UniProtKB/Swiss-Prot annotation:
It comes from the Bacteria. Its EC number is 5.3.1.12. Keywords: Isomerase. PANTHER family: URONATE ISOMERASE. Belongs to the metallo-dependent hydrolases superfamily. Uronate isomerase family. The lineage of its organism: Bacteria, Pseudomonadati, Pseudomonadota, Alphaproteobacteria, Sphingomonadales. This is Uronate isomerase. Disulfide bonds: none annotated. It catalyses: D-glucuronate = D-fructuronate; aldehydo-D-galacturonate = keto-D-tagaturonate. InterPro entries: Metal_Hydrolase (IPR032466), Uronate_isomerase (IPR003766). The keyword Iron does not apply. It comes from Rhizorhabdus wittichii (strain DSM 6014 / CCUG 31198 / JCM 15750 / NBRC 105917 / EY 4224 / RW1). GO terms for molecular function: glucuronate isomerase activity.
């Protein structure tokens, strides 16, 4: 069987209307070569600290990417067959992906992976069962070369800044090694306190003990707990962090008085909290984190509304982040009011909101961000950082929030090699949307070109204080 060619059309994702497409091409030409600013993501800082060669195609492109393996699992492929939870021959795992690559037609994963195959590795045949070994061998051969090591790819991808995400319990040794190495690539961390502010996080009590040991603070008291959090925030800022990130089940906030907070902390610290008390503690700690952000200047991100680890059996067998997180309906208007009542009018706070509940875009999020000085909207996230998801986001938020209450794009990925592809998709979608506004005579083309640069580069640097 003849292998199908792999081509990337230069007009991919541009509007189908010919007149609009011509404008989109011109706008895209203004931003295609701009540096990548990636202010939020989950790549491994060890890669850039050690700069060791990546192992093989499967361990790099398949096993870390839950977008990919959740689709395979949905079609009955055991995770063990691709090397998750059990050792497997990397070539055999790659053949599994090739055998099922047709599942990704019409998905953003197909766009990203095809870009990686074509633009990073120079492949000119589509991944399929008959090309599995050819592509596997070609990728592995290239990964052994110096120009495919993490730092070389970072430079080749024209990345100006890349933020990873770490727990307060992380000693940040890899970030220290990056800074000490003399390499000029800018890789910074971000503060993700979920393991020590969410009573439902596995090992919460032990995590608090580790937090106390790391900081020398007495986390047996609420005052010592807050002091320990401040100490770790300061350590993260010293390591280059400009932001925090909070992955709570809901966007609930609360503003407890000191006595209430102390009693609630004692309850969750002791392990006897009810579900309602755990939610109240998370809610209160978001408000506390906002106050700390005003003090230390760290931008605050909230990523709520994911039902984590929905597949209990999969979580028991493989742990978290295995493709079983599901979007939920999320309230923002009532949930955020306690926090916004304290700090929403303070421009020193920069609070970036994300959602998996698209129904909230126009009804809640755009009106909130279009009013409160402290609020901005993050881009389409996770299940929605797709071409259609990005278009829906633009159409439902721009009229109320404008462009400058948004923060540009972030890729939020573990898949390092897909970062340029994800940013390219966002640039193409934004240029297509702006081209529509030009053709409809809502914007002049010079304004659209200026906005294209804002959405690609300037807004993200401003919002994340980079």
């Amino acid at each position: 069987m003849t292998a199908a060619p792999l081509r990337l059309h230069p007009d991919r994702l541009f509007p189908a209307d010919p007149d609009t497409r011509v404008v989109a091409r011109r706008l895209y030409a203004e931003v295609a070569g701009l540096p990548i600013v990636s202010p939020h993501g989950h790549t491994d800082p060890r890669w850039f600290a050690e700069d060791a060669p990546f192992g093989d195609a499967s361990s790099l492109l398949l096993q870390p990417d839950h977008y990919v393996f959740r689709m395979l699992y949905s079609q009955g492929v055991p995770l063990e067959a691709i090397g998750i939870g059990a050792p497997v021959d990397p070539r055999a795992a790659w053949r599994v992906l090739a055998d099922h690559y047709h599942l990704f037609r019409g998905t953003p994963s197909r766009l990203w992976l095809d870009w990686v195959f074509h633009s990073v590795f120079g492949l000119d045949v589509r991944l399929a069962p008959e090309t599995a070994d050819l592509t596997f061998d070609s990728i592995n051969e290239q990964l052994a070369r110096p120009e495919f090591r993490p730092r070389a790819l970072f430079d080749r991808f024209n990345i100006e800044l890349l933020a990873t995400t770490e727990s307060p319990l992380d000693p940040l040794d890899h970030h220290a090694a990056i800074r000490a190495s003399g390499w000029t690539g800018r890789v910074i961390t971000a503060f993700r306190p979920d393991p020590v502010v969410d009573p439902d996080f596995e090992g919460f009590a032990a995590n608090l003990d580790r937090l106390g040991a790391m900081t020398g603070e007495d986390v047996g008291s609420y005052a010592g707990y807050l002091a320990a959090l401040r100490a770790r925030r300061a350590a993260f800022a010293a390591a280059g962090a400009t932001s925090t990130d909070h992955g709570h089940p809901t966007a609930a906030t609360a503003d407890l008085d000191r006595g209430e907070a102390e009693r609630l902390y004692a309850q969750v610290r002791g392990g006897g909290a009810t579900a309602e008390q755990a939610e109240l503690f998370r809610a209160h700690m978001l408000t506390v984190m906002a106050e700390m952000s005003i003090d230390d200047g760290l931008v605050m991100q909230i990523h709520p509304g994911s039902f984590r680890n929905h597949n209990a059996d999969l979580f028991r067998r493989f742990g978290r982040d295995k493709g079983a997180d599901i979007p939920t309906r999320t309230d923002f208007v009532r949930a955020l009011r306690p926090l916004l009542g304290r700090f929403g009018n303070d421009p020193r706070l920069s609070l970036i909101l994300f959602t998996l509940d698209e129904s909230a875009y126009a009804r809640e999020l755009a009106p909130l961000a279009g009013h409160y000085p402290a609020l901005k909207l993050g881009p389409a996230w996770w299940f929605h950082d797709s071409p259609e998801g990005m278009r829906r986001f633009r159409r439902q938020t721009t009229e109320t929030a404008g462009f400058h209450n948004l923060v540009g794009f972030n890729d939020d990925t573990r898949a390092f090699l897909s970062i340029p592809a994800r940013h390219d998709v966002a640039r193409r979608i934004d240029c297509g949307y702006l081209a529509e506004l030009v053709v409809e005579h809502q914007l002049d083309e010079d304004e659209a070109a200026d906005l294209a640069v804002d959405l690609t580069y300037r807004l993200v640097k401003s919002a994340y204080r980079l």
